[in-house]
Regions:
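Flexible, glycine/threonine- and acidic-rich loop/arm segments that mediate assembly and lattice contacts
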Residues: 1-100, 112-125
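Sequence/fold signature of self-assembling virion shell proteins
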Residues: 79, 117-177
Length: 177
């Protein structure tokens, strides 16, 4: 394994709660706190998601040892529409050729979610069993992965353990200064 430089980002949030505003009010202090906390959590999760997608975009592979039947240009595998249902099954051999034989995590957008749902319609008791295309992967969906013009779906394939979040609390925050 290689030595990586960890880039830290500081995230901080806050909101105001004034107890006297909730006296004689239909909205309780707890209800308003929970609503505000939910907004903060969603915004924080979206910020982390955007940072993760940016890291995936910046770290795309530049070399494919075996691109199978696909075109590979500008660090992107172009999938023809007629092969859209096959790419999920082909990701494992492509990753294995680049020495990533482990469990694959797929980070995709709504177009990939739609593709997986269409593949799932062809299960074990249907006309064609398409489960092998997608069943040995872990899927994560986000609206922060965007399609290029005239594309139906975009995803990143990452081996398990290659992307993560480290938590570090600044000393000043621990000391409340």
């Amino acid at each position: 394994s290689a030595l990586y430089t960890v880039v830290w980002a500081t995230y901080s949030v806050g909101f105001t709660m004034v107890p006297t505003l909730y006296m004689n009010n239909e909205i309780s202090y707890e209800h308003d706190f929970n609503r505000k906390m939910e907004k903060v959590c969603r915004a924080f999760a979206n910020s982390l998601d955007q940072a993760a997608v940016s890291a995936l975009e910046a770290g795309k592979t530049q070399i494919l040892k075996d691109k199978l039947n696909y075109n590979f240009a500008a660090n992107v595998i172009e999938v023809p529409t007629q092969m859209a249902t096959e790419i999920m099954g082909d990701i494992n051999p492509i990753m294995r050729a680049n020495c990533y034989p482990g469990l694959v995590h797929v980070v995709g957008n709504a177009g990939i979610d739609s593709l997986i749902k269409k593949l799932a319609q062809h299960g074990i008791y249907n006309d064609v069993n398409k489960r092998m295309e997608y069943e040995n992967k872990v899927f994560h969906y986000t609206n922060n992965v965007v399609n290029e013009a005239s594309k139906n779906g975009t995803f990143f394939a990452v081996e398990d353990g290659n992307v993560g979040v480290l938590t570090r609390v600044d000393r000043e925050a621990l000391n409340r200064t």
